[in-house]
């Protein structure tokens, strides 16, 4: 369990290695985040640190949210609050700033965000079903095929892959490598792609699993 950081996806680009290889990367504007609450085993039953991110206008926060930040002694209004489990919450203080300096180039991280919503999608797009014949009198072009038997069991089993809403859910991409860390501009350059749209909120944490899982 380790503390992470909040950020927003800027977009994708590419950089070149010393050998001249093009590396696709995602640029993330991460932090600075503010410690807004410290939870301990004695007070809350578990150890965690709550971070606030992205200064915003007062109209975007409820009275309860503003009171929570005031109680923590945080002067600026922060739009996003997220909690991270930690082993030693006593190592942090209310109002402390968390920046990208906690990471180093070459480190593996897990990135969580909300995937791009695709709306209502069919079987092929949502579940990668194969299509039916396109000619010779076939009318089964993009149909799903059988979804179960008849009288027995007389119902569609739960979990049957069918058409429905695609995307728009929480997704975590694991073990992505940090290519560059820029503390002056609060930027993380991550190899590969991360979930979500440009400007979407991301949670970046040190990788929980390093190596092959057995």
UniProtKB/Swiss-Prot annotation:
GO terms for cellular component: cytosolic large ribosomal subunit. Pfam families: Ribosomal_L3. PROSITE patterns: RIBOSOMAL_L3. GO terms for molecular function: rRNA binding; structural constituent of ribosome. SUPFAM superfamilies: Translation proteins (SSF50447). InterPro entries: Ribosomal_uL3, Ribosomal_uL3_bac/org-type, Ribosomal_uL3_CS, Transl_B-barrel_sf. One of its GO terms (biological process) is translation. Part of the 50S ribosomal subunit. Forms a cluster with proteins L14 and L19. PANTHER family: 50S RIBOSOMAL PROTEIN L3, LARGE RIBOSOMAL SUBUNIT PROTEIN UL3C. Belongs to the universal ribosomal protein uL3 family. This is Large ribosomal subunit protein uL3. It comes from Synechococcus sp. (strain JA-2-3B'a(2-13)). The gene is rplC.
């Amino acid at each position: 369990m380790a503390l992470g950081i909040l950020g927003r996806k800027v977009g994708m680009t590419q950089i070149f290695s010393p050998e001249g290889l093009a590396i696709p990367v995602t640029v993330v504007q991460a932090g600075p985040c503010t410690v807004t609450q410290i939870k301990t085993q004695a007070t809350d039953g578990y150890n965690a640190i709550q971070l606030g991110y992205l200064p915003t206008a007062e109209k975007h926060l409820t009275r309860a949210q503003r009171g929570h930040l005031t109680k923590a002694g945080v002067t600026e209004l922060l739009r996003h609050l997220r909690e991270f489990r930690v082993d030693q919450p006593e190592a942090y203080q209310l109002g402390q700033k968390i920046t990208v300096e906690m990471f180093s180039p070459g480190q593996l991280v897990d990135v969580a965000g909300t995937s791009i919503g695709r709306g209502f999608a069919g079987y092929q797009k949502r579940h990668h079903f194969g299509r039916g014949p396109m000619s010779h009198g076939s009318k089964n072009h993009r149909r799903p095929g059988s979804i179960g038997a008849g009288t027995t069991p007389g119902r569609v089993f739960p979990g049957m892959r069918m058409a429905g809403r695609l995307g728009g859910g929480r997704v975590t991409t694991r073990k992505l490598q940090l290519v560059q860390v820029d503390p002056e501009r609060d930027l993380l350059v991550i190899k590969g792609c991360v979930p979500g749209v440009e400007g979407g909120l991301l949670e970046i944490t040190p990788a929980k699993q390093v190596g092959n899982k057995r």
